[in-house]
């Protein structure tokens, strides 16, 4: 396949896997926080604060994956090499 097509596929699959992992992690965190609050309603403030901090950390994974995918798509260091190879093949 062409280099840029492979870059688009890699970015798409990378973002899909990153979003899937982030969604599973956030779902499990919220599930456990809700279970903790249902067992001990008095500790809901500490549990919810800790959950929010944890969710922010988990969400940072999706942001990092997005940044890497954008780098693959728009600031790829091998773009010039691929263009030169394509020109050589065309000649």
From Swiss-Prot:
Keywords: ATP synthesis, Cell inner membrane, Cell membrane, CF(0), Hydrogen ion transport, Ion transport, Lipid-binding, Membrane, Transmembrane, Transmembrane helix, Transport. The keyword tRNA processing does not apply. GO terms for molecular function: lipid binding; proton-transporting ATP synthase activity, rotational mechanism. InterPro entries: ATP_synth_csu_bac/chlpt, ATP_synth_F0_csu, ATP_synth_F0_csu_DDCD_BS, ATPase_proteolipid_c-like_dom, F/V-ATP_Csub_sf. It is a multi-pass membrane protein. It is found in: Cell inner membrane. Its main location: membrane. Gene3D superfamilies: lithium bound rotor ring of v- atpase. The record marks 59 as: Reversibly protonated during proton transport. Pfam families: ATP-synt_C. CDD domains: ATP-synt_Fo_c. The chain crosses the membrane at residues 4-24, 53-73. It comes from the Bacteria. GO terms for cellular component: plasma membrane; proton-transporting ATP synthase complex; proton-transporting two-sector ATPase complex, proton-transporting domain. The keyword Transmembrane helix applies. GO terms for biological process: proton motive force-driven ATP synthesis. F-type ATPases have 2 components, F(1) - the catalytic core - and F(0) - the membrane proton channel. F(1) has five subunits: alpha(3), beta(3), gamma(1), delta(1), epsilon(1). F(0) has three main subunits: a(1), b(2) and c(10-14). The alpha and beta chains form an alternating ring which encloses part of the gamma chain. F(1) is attached to F(0) by a central stalk formed by the gamma and epsilon chains, while a peripheral stalk is formed by the delta and b chains. NCBIfam families: ATP_synt_c. Belongs to the ATPase C chain family. F(1)F(0) ATP synthase produces ATP from ADP in the presence of a proton or sodium gradient. F-type ATPases consist of two structural domains, F(1) containing the extramembraneous catalytic core and F(0) containing the membrane proton channel, linked together by a central stalk and a peripheral stalk. During catalysis, ATP synthesis in the catalytic domain of F(1) is coupled via a rotary mechanism of the central stalk subunits to proton translocation. Key component of the F(0) channel; it plays a direct role in translocation across the membrane. A homomeric c-ring of between 10-14 subunits forms the central stalk rotor element with the F(1) delta and epsilon subunits. This is ATP synthase subunit c. It comes from Geobacter sulfurreducens (strain ATCC 51573 / DSM 12127 / PCA). The gene is atpE.
